Amino acid sequence: MDVILTVNGLCKYYKHDKALSGLSLTVPKGAIYGLVGQNGSGKTTLIRLLTGLQKPSDGNFTLYGIRNDEKGIEKARRRMSAIIETPAIYRDMTARDNLRQQYRILGQPSESGIDELLHLVGLGDTGSKKAGHFSLGMRQRLGIAIALAGDPDFLILDEPINGLDPQGIIEMRELILKLNRERQITILISSHILAELSKLATHYGFIDHGHMVKEIDAKELEAACRKCLRLTVSDGKTLATVLDGMQAEYCFLSEKEAEIYSDMRVTKLVCALAEADCEVLSIQEREESLESYYIRLIGGGRYEQAV
């Protein structure tokens, strides 16, 4: 297996806070690697270390076979591009002028590549419209076009769909898949929006409080996820009381929605809830979600998704 990135026992300390604590991971060539973790789990800190914005307190990583403390690491980083938190764009410039500026910074000729990149990210028809008047999704896609100006074969995206509307999420998903499949770009995506990440990733790294809990590929994850009942009710507290009384294994996805993993008769459960004056709004059999799998990995509780 060809490997783009290997992280070995990486640590980052801020006074008394451990942002990363012995984190290790491997990103195979050609993968869409989903870095899964709640806000504050260390995802953005890792990306800052990989891009050279910060230095690790301990441990190391290898990028294209070059260790981060070796002379060739900056050359290796030129094969990588990253968008951290929000894309750096000039809001008073058009999409085309933003790309021209990026090519100037890189010291590369620009005109031949601009039209191709604008078309690739779906911004070919924006004309004289300034980036400041773009939607959030358009600005995110412009950020990716700027990141692609140096022709990288490894792209790091930090929360690329955070804050996007449904149409923007679909457009971003299609773009990420196109970059991976048609341009063979390896992509590392940091995200806490797991329902969307599950539609993209070929590999996953689940992190919690700065350390790696588990690495797994998509096929292994599919095999590991269990059958379950997904239930939406009128009163989540009553549902929990009923399930506890039945000694059921369950996980809440939201205040009134839960996945139940115990083997039980649906009619028995519905009757018990009716007796407790808890209305069942929806019930369906399905595979365990990526979200509940992560909750199970880190030991229970509810997965908190900041909006």
Feature map (PLM): residue ranges:
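Conserved ABC transporter NBD signature motif
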Residues: 59-69, 75-76
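Helical segment within the ABC ATPase nucleotide-binding domain
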Residues: 170-183
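Short, charged/small-residue-rich alpha-helical element at the C-terminal edge
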Residues: 227-297
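Helix-to-loop junction immediately C-terminal to a conserved catalytic motif
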Residues: 51
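Conserved ABC ATPase "signature" region
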Residues: 100, 111-126
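Catalytic Walker B motif of ABC-type/P-loop ATPase nucleotide-binding domains
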Residues: 155-159
